Amino acid sequence: MAGMVIAIGGAGVAQQRGEWPGITGGYTGTRYSTLDQINASNFNNLKVAWEWRGEKDAGIPLGGEVNARSLPIYVDGMLITTAGPRRTVVSLDPATGKTLWTFQEPVTPRQEYSMRANHGKGVAFARVNGRGVVFISTPAFFLHALDAKTGRPLENWGGAVPVLGFPKTGSVDLLKDLIADWEPWTSLKQQYDPNAGIPLKIGYITSSSPPLIVNDVVIVGNSAEQGYNQTRIENVPGDILAYDARTGKHLWKFHVIPRPGEFGHETWENDAWKWTGDVSSWAPLSADPERGLVYIPTNGATMDYYGGFRPGDNLFSSSVIALDVKTGKRVWHYQLVKHDIWNYDTPTPPVLMDVTVNGRRIPGLFQVTKQAYVYSFNRQTGEPIWPMEMRPAPQSKVPGEKLPATQPHPTRPAPFDLQGRTEDHLIDYTPEIKKLALAEAQRRGLLAPLFAPPTHRGNAEGAGPANICPGGGGGANITGPPAADPTSGVLFITSTSGCSLTMLAPAKERDNPRMTGSTISPWARGGGGGDAADAGAGRGRGAVGRGGAAASTGGNPLAGIPGIFKGPVGRIVAIDMNTGEHLWMIPHGETAQETQDAFRNNPLLKGVKVDTNWGRSGHAAMMATPTLLFATGMTADNRPNLFGIDKKTGTRVGAVQTPSLGGYGLMTYLHNNKQYVVIPVPGGYTAMALP
């Protein structure tokens, strides 16, 4: 077998053919294509080439949540993706969007329970013995290998799964391999049921991102239920699994929660390593085939906002881990957040590209984060490209919680969005406005540092919910992964300036017995707050959104101003990773016109020049080509658009209206000498091309 041929430092052979062989464009997470048929001179001529909707065009039930998370791959003239809560694999005609074939895993209780069923982000591709093969990991946590041309399960691959309706070959039960040496399962001494999986009282595992095939090895990540909903402390660890791409044979497993004798075991006190879990890799993986390394971004441990039952730094949660592809051995790691209680999962695949720093060529790895930092490493050694500082961290007053004394902070590049909320972040168009904004921030308890810990109900200080900024939605997040130009070393990041007002309450008050685990935590999120605007209202018609808005009720002198903290509320930032310098920053899309008008007409701003475009809350879907950054966004008249942006200046050079607003990235391919741009939209895709 020869896997995808992608040059780490450049666009690679596959992309030179106009292919998009992985959901991020290849192994590197750059979302970069060498295609330039669409450029600044003709961008505004783009038209809808075809549209595909899973329910209408393939009979795929969409379920309660409409999927807009998956991106197709394009290789060997085939366009292949996933759709729907059963993660149906679909092959589409690249020129028309017509459905060519589908593959759907039989229904199981494991699939029906999955909280990530509609979170599928796509498929993986490799050549096995000269044949194109598609790999898919499913909500029920099975792995399937399919013939890319027909969608049929691969012969003599994997084994027979003893569940009604499953193919006789071409499948692997990932759960069985995951729990084979896990004590909470083995101590139950009960027969394994591949249909039902494991009892919820010990945990549940699923998947959202596709596997990655590197040097004949299929590497599989996973995900758990959303940690912000958890109330119980038991769960299964999200260990990384690997299989032979040619046979389906299980090769190795990496323990994300170290066991006795393994590196990092001492970071789990209270014997929490025995029974708690998560630390999954729900974001897509990246890899360097030439170096034989795969890079794993992980999330936090069980329960996003309380970790008193798991004292210690909790390796390898909220980290980037480099593993040897052949052996699964750890080569290096860096923990971005110690003892994560902020929902600061590592949310996007690491971006791999070579850069020149102070005259020295470095194989770089760049990890964007919810906390609005870019962490920069030598991807071979794990050495930070610029110094990291361990700075004192705020401490928790929640009973039972013990936080690390310090947290790591990159010294370069500067944060790409607001961190915490300080007086320097307040709007200051005039001294009077600054004074009013400060009073509002103090009244609502909104001033807080980065890594402000959650408060708890009934605290002695009478404090309200902690203002965690950025919140669990970022900063950066998977809803808008970064893009990069590996030829110049420039990284493009989309971020949002939202915060999360977070207070804990006794977990027994909001316990849900359908969730995993059996022991109720002392505390869980739910004492008040939630995703919040920076300064109150503003969620109504024309509102900017989670970035914050001043209350619009009568008598408020700040009425109409979108927020008491500086905008934009959503942004796109370009950073030269050769120097760590910010090149430009623009708002993500355009604030609704009625909001801009109310902003401009505030009496306190009479005679003051103000930029009323604070963009839109949320993230853009992006990709890069030799001349352009493509990004989705809304215009002031509330119409979804695809924008063409000059990569050097951030200037918009084109805009075309699209049927729906996209998310989770873009992709492009060349088919029959025509370049297409595919936008994931609710329930399917819209493809744009020149007439």
Segments predicted by a language model, with ranges:
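Bacterial N-terminal signal peptides
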Residues: 1-9
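Mature N-terminal segment immediately following signal peptide/propeptide cleavage
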Residues: 12-57, 72-74, 382, 573
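N-terminal pre-domain segments of enzymes
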Residues: 12-38, 405-439, 525-549
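Repeat-blade elements of multi-bladed beta-propeller folds
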Residues: 20-24, 64-88, 114-142, 203-232, ...
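Short, solvent-exposed loop/turn elements at domain surfaces
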Residues: 27-34, 56-62, 81-82, 89-90, ...
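Short, polar loop/linker segments at the starts of domains and inter-domain junctions
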Residues: 30-42, 60-68, 267-270, 467
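Extracytoplasmic/lumenal domain signature
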Residues: 44-57, 89-113, 143-201, 233, ...
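Long, low-complexity segments enriched in small/aliphatic residues
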Residues: 407, 411-498, 571-574
